[in-house]
Design a protein with these regions (language model features):
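Conserved mid-core segment of classical short-chain dehydrogenase/reductases
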Residues: 70, 93-108, 152-155
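Active-site helix of classical SDR
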Residues: 122, 159
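The beta1-alpha1 cofactor-binding region of Rossmann-like NAD(H)/NADP(H)-dependent oxidoreductases
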Residues: 41, 60-71, 104
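Residue(s) in the substrate-gating loop at a strand-loop-helix junction
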Residues: 142
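C-terminal helical subdomain
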Residues: 176, 183-184, 203-245, 249
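Conserved glycine-rich Rossmann-like NAD(P)H-binding loop of the short-chain dehydrogenase/reductase
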Residues: 31-45
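Catalytic Tyr-X3-Lys loop
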Residues: 100-119, 134, 138, 163
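Conserved glycine-rich cofactor-binding loop
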Residues: 15-17
Length: 252
């Protein structure tokens, strides 16, 4: 495995789930990690798991607030004066996902939490990477970012399609600065966001899903790829296809 020693990575949504797993995996490859999320407690827990090497730095922020995102950027500038990797992972969903239940407030929550915050993070990361003529952006979208379905809800789907478009647009414009962008589209992953599903997901079903550590390993692999390559888009799903099997049962 290629070493990431000397690299600085900023991981958002780092307190749980995919973000936590990505932070641990990239740290294991030697990178210094800046952990960001809304809640300091989970971030501190993640930091304690990697801080024997002194490589974790906790910077809580509400990524829907541009000034708080800029403050994290200022911390990175003052502490390291470089940023090599952004894992743009923070995201949210809600229980009431159907059009007849949506409100202006819930629409704002979904768009700001899944798309606006990610855009803010990119605008903070790019100046570092342009200066360095090198940098990698990895964005967690969802299968909902490429395919239309009823499970994730329409506004979440809109936001994740935006993440996909953002990443491909970054590769078009920023390649001249040595910057690469990957959009990661996982299927069902056993993370706390499942608790927001309208119908509860039991432990047996969760055990068959993609696990956060699987995502962390993939993100580390992307982070260690040679600079002359870019993985534009990558899908990862469980081999147990719950959607197909549920449809089959309904047909029977």
């Amino acid at each position: 495995m290629t070493s990431l020693t000397g690299k600085v990575a900023w991981v958002t949504g780092a307190g749980t789930g995919i973000g936590e797993a990505a932070a641990l995996a990239i740290a294991d490859a030697g990178a210094t990690i800046v952990l960001t999320g809304r809640r300091p407690g989970p971030l501190e827990n993640v930091a304690r798991r990697m801080n024997e090497a002194g490589i974790a730095h906790v910077q809580p922020a509400d990524l829907t607030k541009a000034d708080e995102v800029r403050d994290v950027g200022k911390y990175i500038r003052a502490s390291f004066n470089r940023l090599d990797i952004l894992v743009n992972n923070a995201g949210v969903n809600i229980v009431e996902r159907h059009w007849d239940k949506l409100t202006p407030e819930s629409i704002d929550t979904l768009l700001e939490g899944n798309l606006t915050g990610a855009l803010y993070c990119v605008t903070v990361a790019l100046p570092f990477m342009r200066e360095q003529k090198d940098g990698l952006l990895i964005h967690t979208a969802s299968m909902a970012g490429r395919f239309i379905g009823g499970l994730s809800g329409p506004i979440y789907t809109v936001a994740k399609h935006g993440i996909v478009a953002m990443s491909h647009g970054l590769n078009m414009q920023e390649c001249v600065h040595g910057i690469r962008s990957t959009v990661f589209l996982p299927g069902e992953v056993a993370t706390p966001i499942l608790d927001k599903r309208p119908n509860p997901v039991g432990p047996e079903a969760r055990a068959r899903m993609v696990q956060p550590a699987d995502c962390g390993d993939l993100i580390r692999y992307i982070a260690c790829m040679p600079k002359h390559l870019v993985m534009n888009e990558v899908h990862l799903s469980p081999s147990h296809n719950r959607g197909y099997l549920a449809a089959l049962e309904r047909q029977i």
